[in-house]
Amino acid sequence: AQQDAIAYIIAEIPTNPRVEVPDLEALKKVLSMSRKTSSGEKAIEPVFILDQTFCPNLHFLSDGATLSSVKAIAYASGSKFPSGGLCTAGYCIANKKGDVFTSKIALHLELCDNEATDLQYEILAKQLPSMNQRIKDAYKNTREFVNFIEKVLPQAKINFVSQVLASQGFTPSVFSLDLPTKGNTAQEKETYKRALNHKLIKAMITQIPDQSKYCVSYGQLKGCYWTIPATSTQGTTKEGDKDYIARVSVSPQINLALHKKVFLDFVQSI
């Protein structure tokens, strides 16, 4: 604001890997505040850029929605729920206040030859109609799996949306799992936990090889994906800041009973 420049604010809702959702009303209030330049003139409004890959079913920017009154653009990774993992093309939309940017984005895609291919359009057109139902079914499976883990391993810390947030439409099918550890020093505890993480994932991918995969993606059509560190973006994160917890992505089609059995066997082995 002081420089009379445009502030581009980028946020991921829910966050990855800890599946956090901010107070949207508070966010709206901050984004809507009137600010002044160094000369006392009214500053340019900020632009809010939302990554809603983990909840592509939510209408954050529709008329009357919380963020409809601020300049906003939302995007989702097409490689996740929109295509069920069948293509990599994503998409973005803007609300009425942010629509001025749509033509600029389209021009950028054209100049960079970065538009989706005909095949990608075809895949998205085929998969998008079933997306909301797939999200609903996957969330149901995830909630059941999370409840089971909380029951058989209450010492574990699970990052997942609350029932209250779920009732508001935040129904992701991914959670992060911080396994209990032991040791006399922080280093011993971290080493033990990392070994335990790999023991769990090895059990899952070897005992359920047709469904459990060591993969960082999300929104897949079937099976269960496990990964450590909990997000692919941590490949560029310095080692000391990496989050060595397991991220688990559950699908609408999964043998949940078998996954529960393998997890229970794992718990009993530690």
Question: Model segments located where?
Answer:
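Conserved small-domain helix->loop->beta segment predominantly found in fold-type I
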Residues: 123-135, 143-243
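Short beta-strand-to-loop capping motifs
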Residues: 94, 177-181, 250-252
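PLP-dependent enzyme catalytic core of the Aspartate aminotransferase-like
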Residues: 1-7, 21-42, 222-270
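Short, acidic Gly/Pro/Ser/Thr-rich loop/turn segments
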Residues: 100, 182-185, 255
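Generic structural signal for residues positioned in beta-strands
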Residues: 74, 174-176, 247
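Conserved PLP-enzyme active-site core in the AAT-like
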Residues: 1-150
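Structural alpha-beta junctions
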Residues: 32-44, 68-71, 150-157, 202-216, ...
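Conserved beta-strand positions
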Residues: 11, 50, 177, 248-250
